[in-house]
Amino acid sequence: MAPKTEPGRRVVADNRSARFHYAIEDTFEAGIALTGTEVKSLRGGKATIGESYAGPSGNDLMLFNAYIPEYLEANRFNHDTKRPRRLLLHRRQINKLIGATQRQGYTVIPLKIYFNDKGRAKVELGLGKGKQLHDKRESVKQRDWQRDKARLMRDKG
């Protein structure tokens, strides 16, 4: 069955492995400063955020290593595919995220890139710590148990 989405929210890129590799404690919604060809390429549904992360650059928070492919109909005015992109957050949120990454060993990971109901590109950021190997095994056990439990309930009912 297809996953249910919120009305007016069209997901372009999803970082599904982030919740497996990191224990996400808090999420934030941020805007992205994009060029015109980047927006057109995102509307085509092509982006990769599997290896990307967010980090401080001066007083701002930037999205690093996010791949947005070149727009095919653009000519010489195309964008760099892996350039750092500025994240648009309130100053209080930026200070909280930068402080957590510098002092407490947290990482800021992009979880999704989507268009909201107004047509603006947004990033869902997760603040979390990396999981150890035994934590990942526990996550796999929990997922398998939930799957087996659902299968048993379906077969009994």
Swiss-Prot record:
Regions of compositional bias (Basic and acidic residues) in chain numbering: 132-157
Disulfide bonds: none
UniProt superkingdom: Bacteria
GO cellular component, one term: cytosol
GO MF, one example: RNA binding
Keyword tags: Cytoplasm, RNA-binding
Protein name per its UniProtKB record: SsrA-binding protein
Organism: Methylorubrum populi (strain ATCC BAA-705 / NCIMB 13946 / BJ001)
